[in-house]
Amino acid sequence: MERQPTTDRMIQEYVPGKQVTLAHLIANPGKDLFKKLGLPESVSAIGILTITPSEASIIACDIATKSGAVEIGFLDRFTGAVVLTGDVSAVEYALKQVTRTLGEMMRFTACPITRT
């Protein structure tokens, strides 16, 4: 009897660590985006962060609002999602401060900031 080749199986499981998995700046978004997100149209930039553990999103908002003229557009402490609003330079600086502080001070793994 001929032996059948065995199939290796791999189970991948996400185990959250201390991570900033998304840090993105949307400069001058379209008005439709503001409307769909329920954000004020008076700002010129949106910053988006996704952080684990999700409780660190509260720390991220504290860092961001203390860094300059940004507002919290949305904070979900259960999923780690953060949306910041303000002018482009203020939101960009806030994202830099959040990723730097979480990365260097708190030893999170932080992704680079992306921009559109």
UniProtKB/Swiss-Prot annotation:
Superkingdom field: Bacteria
Coiled-coil intervals, chain numbering: none
Pathway assigned in UniProt: Polyol metabolism; 1,2-propanediol degradation
GO biological process: propanediol catabolic process
Domain called BMC circularly permuted: residue spans: 9-108
Pfam families listed in its UniProt record: BMC
Annotated keywords: Bacterial microcompartment, Transport
Biotechnology remark: Artificial BMCs can be made in E.coli by expressing pduA-pduB/B'-pduJ-pduK-pduN-pduU-pduT (in this order); pduT and pduU are optional, while pduA, pduB/B', pduJ, pduK and pduN are essential. A construct with the reversed gene order does not make BMCs. Ethanogenic BMCs can be made in E.coli by targeting pyruvate decarboxylase (pdc) and alcohol dehydrogenase (adh) to them. PduP(1-18)-Pdc and PduD(1-18)-Adh strains targeted to the BMC (PduA, PduB, PduJ, PduK, PduN, PduU) make significantly more ethanol than strains where Pdc and Adh are not targeted to the BMC.
Location in or out of the cell: Bacterial microcompartment
Principal location class: other
Any GO CC annotation of this UniProt entry: bacterial microcompartment
NCBIfam families the UniProt entry points to: PRK15468.1 (NF012012)
Assembly with partners or alone: Homohexamer with a central pore lined by a beta-barrel. Hexamers pack into a loose array. Interacts with PduV, probably via the beta-barrel, which is predicted by modeling to be on the exterior of the BMC. Interacts with shell protein PduA.
Domain notes: One side of the hexamer is concave which is lined by hydrophobic residues, the other side has a slightly protruding, 6-stranded beta-barrel.
Entry-linked PANTHER family: BACTERIAL MICROCOMPARTMENT SHELL PROTEIN EUTS (PTHR40449:SF2), ETHANOLAMINE UTILIZATION PROTEIN EUTS (PTHR40449)
Similarity-based family: Belongs to the EutS/PduU family.
Role played: A minor shell protein of the bacterial microcompartment (BMC) dedicated to 1,2-propanediol (1,2-PD) degradation. May selectively transport specific metabolites. Not absolutely required to make artificial BMCs. Proteins such as this one with circularly permuted BMC domains may play a key role in conferring heterogeneity and flexibility in this BMC.
Protein name: Bacterial microcompartment shell protein PduU
Organism field: Citrobacter freundii
